[in-house]
Amino acid sequence: MERSKGKVSVFLARLAWAVWILYAAAWSWALLTPQPVRLRDALLDETPALVSSKVVHVAGYLAFTMLSGCLRPAVPYRWLILAFLSLHAFGTEYLQQFVPQRTPSLHDVGLDHVGIVLGLAITWKWWLGTSASAA
């Protein structure tokens, strides 16, 4: 029984990492291509478009942080993941200056970090608890 339990937990850990990597790739793509902006502008007027894009920044990083909490790595690596999320926010905003119809904004980086903080607040037990490998 213990042996099969270990196999299940290894499978779930690998699945969590696979989902995290897919989300990271999809979120990066969404932030670094003009298609989401074109779709937003085709569907919404100026004010709702602006509000929706800001909500998406917060929600995207909130989800990214929650997914990161699901990984439950050893404690020192948790802080590396949070550093990665922060650098991802800065990096994608910086790179947006090279993408047509995208504009970099420190305000958006701030909103990204609001999403990170909200994600931490929601999943704080995952971030402060024992790692999955130690449990």
State where each predicted segment sits.
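Bulky hydrophobic segments
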Residues: 2-107, 113-135
